[in-house]
Regions:
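Short amphipathic beta-strand/extended segments with alternating polar/hydrophobic composition
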Residues: 13-22, 99-106, 205-212, 240-245
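Oligomerization/assembly interface segments of phage tail-like spikes and tubes
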Residues: 46-69, 115-128, 258
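Hydrophobic residues positioned within well-ordered beta-strands of beta-sheet architectures
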Residues: 61-63, 101, 119-121, 182, ...
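"Short basic amphipathic alpha-helical interaction patches in structured regions
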Residues: 63, 74-82, 118-120, 135-140
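Short, acidic/charged, Gly/Pro-enriched secondary-structure junctions
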Residues: 66-108, 259-261
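Short beta-strand and beta-hairpin "edge-sheet" elements
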Residues: 91-133
């Protein structure tokens, strides 16, 4: 069994499955991985070619729906939820995955003069990956729980219920099989002028040089097509992309383990920030 839902740019959502009295989903194309484009260069007097690069093409999702019940009214509803040229979000779930993908409605064709009216909807997705509904969160400083049952506390000899562990290296695990970006949320607990987040496996680092103040929040997005750096201070959001040091890398999370550390004002022992990594698992197909 599967569930299909669409959400238009205004946030209005329509569930298309389990409503056979109105809509019956006949077929969905594009749930498999998008085709790849392989770029090669022929080599004179040699068999084959030299590999240059590869990329995934735009994903084309085509949904075929039989319109039942009040056909006129239900067809017009589809026009509202699948407006051509506009952005839509398609939610799909089955027994193993619960994902969404964003795209733009290329076409919506209906056979108006057929007794059993069908609608065929084509959605082009510039980002060809499905994303998990659930976000995964990893903090770079963790709390160690020390509270166990049964227990007793001596008034003259108290014991800690929990304590903070300041981790210089944290594993941000990518459960998927494809690279993905990450959103890094930094909360300043004191003033500082420089912070570097570094992938200790690759050596890639992202450094911000700025006069940060206590209680500032810095949000870094490394997702392709959405790269940004914003500062939230006293409730006001400011674009501080110019604070990114020139040699910085907006790193991607490879499949599996990704080890990160940080340095504040060049001091490895500085503990005056809380850092959180938020990401989604991405899939080529469902």
């Amino acid at each position: 069994m599967f569930r299909l839902e669409v959400e238009n740019a205004t946030g209005a959502a329509l569930v298309l499955t389990g409503k056979e009295a109105q809509y019956q989903v006949i077929n969905i194309e594009g749930l498999n991985p998008a085709p790849a484009q392989i770029n090669t260069t022929p080599i004179a007097n040699l068999d084959g070619a030299l590999f240059n690069s590869s990329r995934l093409d735009v994903k084309n999702i085509v949904i075929t729906i039989r319109i039942n019940g009040d056909v006129e009214r239900n067809r017009l509803r589809l026009y509202d939820y699948f407006p051509t040229k506009e952005r839509v979000t398609i939610y799909y779930s089955n027994d193993t995955r619960d994902v969404f993908i964003e795209g733009y409605v290329e076409n919506l064709e209906c056979d108006l003069f057929n007794i059993s009216e069908l609608a065929q909807i084509s959605v082009l997705c510039p980002d060809p990956y499905f994303q998990s509904i659930d976000e995964l969160v990893t903090d770079i400083s963790n709390t160690i729980a020390l509270f166990h049952f049964p227990f007793a506390i001596d008034y003259d000899d108290p014991v800690p219920i929990s304590e903070y562990e300041i981790s210089r290296i944290t594993n941000v695990y990518n459960e998927g099989s494809s690279e993905t970006g990450v959103i890094i949320d930094i909360l300043a607990k004191s003033d500082f002028s420089s912070i570097t987040i570094q992938n200790v496996q690759t050596g890639d680092g992202l450094t911000l040089d700025y006069a940060f103040l206590t209680n500032d929040e810095i949000i870094i997005n490394t997702n392709k097509g959405h790269k940004s750096v914003f500062l939230i201070r006293s409730g006001r959001s400011t674009n501080i992309f110019t604070a990114v040091r020139r040699d910085s890398v907006f790193f991607q999370l490879k499949a599996g383990d990704n080890l990160f550390g940080y340095v504040v004002n060049g001091d490895l022992q500085n503990e005056d920030v809380n850092i959180r990594f938020t990401r989604r698992t991405i899939y080529r197909g469902v």
